[in-house]
Amino acid sequence: MNSRLQEIRARQTLRRKLLAQQLGAESADSIGAVLNSKDEQREIAETRETSRASYDTSATVSKRKMPEEGEADEEVIEECKDAVEPQKEEENLPYREEIYKDSSTFLKGTQSLNPHNDYCQHFVDTGHRPQNFIRDVGLADRFEEYPKLRELIRLKDELISKSNTPPMYLQADLESFDLRELKSEFDVILLEPPLEEYFRETGIAANEKWWTWEDIMKLDIEGIAGSRAFVFLWCGSGEGLDFGRMCLRKWGFRRSEDICWIKTNKDNPGKTKTLDPKAIFQRTKEHCLMGIKGTVHRSTDGDFIHANVDIDLIITEEPEIGNIEKPVEIFHIIEHFCLGRRRLHLFGRDSTIRPGWLTVGPTLTNSNFNSETYASYFNTPNSPLTGCTEEIERLRPKTPPPKSDRGFGASRGGGRGGPSAGRGERGRERNRGSFRGDRGNFRGRGGPHRGVFAPR
């Protein structure tokens, strides 16, 4: 414990020295003086002088004994009374808390009690949102400090680019178009519906018809989804979260993730949108719900999914007013996660056409989709999957093996009563033929499969 405490103190001392060098302070103890602005330093100096002067005066008065009326003249008595009365008035004044109103020397990395580390106050002063200061958010520099993960991303991008189908697109009115006419099942379906709230927040008239959640729910997604598939549904920042979950349930999907898009305003601080009449605060994020259909386990279905390659956050600059396009990073997240090659993008636009995807939307200006040509890309049994290389399999994050496979089962809990006494018997339970508690193919308390089905 002492060594740990010494290590923490040493790191704290080093941190203060580095801050002193960055701020140009003489020593680590003088950081506080550098953080204060000139006006604050002047106020502090005046306060110190005033308090020192009042202290000296009170000390002088306290040392001088109040003369009695018979021992001194009236002038001395009045002088002592005038010195004591202001001191009593100051004691009776209510305490006023100092309110911090300036963040001109806003600094990251300082103590949390320091007001200069107040991101909310900095937003009030400058208009810069707190998320503007999150580091390494771009695709290029996100994994600079993680060479293995950076190499994994590079290898996966190369494999995806080689296995992608040519970009195909179809101009269609999704209100009347039957999705079953695509004559294909899809592993991934991305929906980007033009919601009413997008146009309500921007205050600009819609160039295209916006969709209600009742209309979105009528889409025949369940008819084109594969036996194991994923759906990604952009549902805005407000009431769409609840309606989005309802859509997933209606289509036969289970909600498994919530990808959050955090919008920064580095290029245009202080920019405000038209406030949603249903909202109290400005909304600076959107949600993309991910649903799963079928049985997919990251520990056993490595041929179909690679989990934990990306994070569930997208941090990019907020688009201009009137632009409802979503960040392109959502495509990278989907392609890195799901190894299925049959990808469908609904409500796509000309700017979202990309290799490996079939884009369908009412605002597309052209079409090149042919159902027979598209189906020919997936004729062989393994052709619907991108596949995987040995190097990618070695680098990708995996589920830790169960304790029984690591040799912990039989030795756990072996105690004083011998190898077969106490809880040490838990690891041997699976070697027994049957026992009275083995009901419904579930193991009892002593088995390693408590609460789950026995492996097939």
UniProtKB/Swiss-Prot annotation:
Belongs to the MT-A70-like family. Heterodimer; heterodimerizes with mettl3 to form an antiparallel heterodimer that constitutes an active methyltransferase. Component of the WMM complex, a N6-methyltransferase complex composed of a catalytic subcomplex, named MAC, and of an associated subcomplex, named MACOM. The MAC subcomplex is composed of mettl3 and mettl14. It comes from the Eukaryota. PANTHER family: N6-ADENOSINE-METHYLTRANSFERASE NON-CATALYTIC SUBUNIT. Transmembrane segments: none annotated. GO terms for cellular component: nucleus; RNA N6-methyladenosine methyltransferase complex. The record marks 146, 242, 245, 298 as: Interaction with METTL3. Residues 39-51, 423-441 have a biased composition (Basic and acidic residues). Residues 410-421 have a biased composition (Gly residues). GO terms for biological process: forebrain radial glial cell differentiation; gliogenesis; mRNA destabilization; mRNA processing; mRNA splicing, via spliceosome; RNA methylation; spermatogenesis; stem cell population maintenance. InterPro entries: METTL14-like, MT-A70-like. Residues 245-254, 297-298 are annotated as: Positively charged region required for RNA-binding. One of its GO terms (molecular function) is mRNA binding. PROSITE patterns: MT_A70, SAM_MTA70L_2. Its main location: nucleus. Residues 52-61 have a biased composition (Polar residues). Residues 135-136, 237-238, 255-258, 278-287, 308-312 are annotated as: Interaction with METTL3. Keywords: Differentiation, Nucleus, RNA-binding, Spermatogenesis. The keyword tRNA-binding does not apply. The METTL3-METTL14 heterodimer forms a N6-methyltransferase complex that methylates adenosine residues at the N(6) position of some mRNAs and regulates the circadian clock, differentiation of embryonic stem cells and cortical neurogenesis. In the heterodimer formed with mettl3, mettl14 constitutes the RNA-binding scaffold that recognizes the substrate rather than the catalytic core. N6-methyladenosine (m6A), which takes place at the 5'-[AG]GAC-3' consensus sites of some mRNAs, plays a role in mRNA stability and processing. Residues 39-74, 395-456 are annotated as: Disordered. This is N(6)-adenosine-methyltransferase non-catalytic subunit METTL14. It is found in: Nucleus. The lineage of its organism: Eukaryota, Metazoa, Chordata, Craniata, Vertebrata.
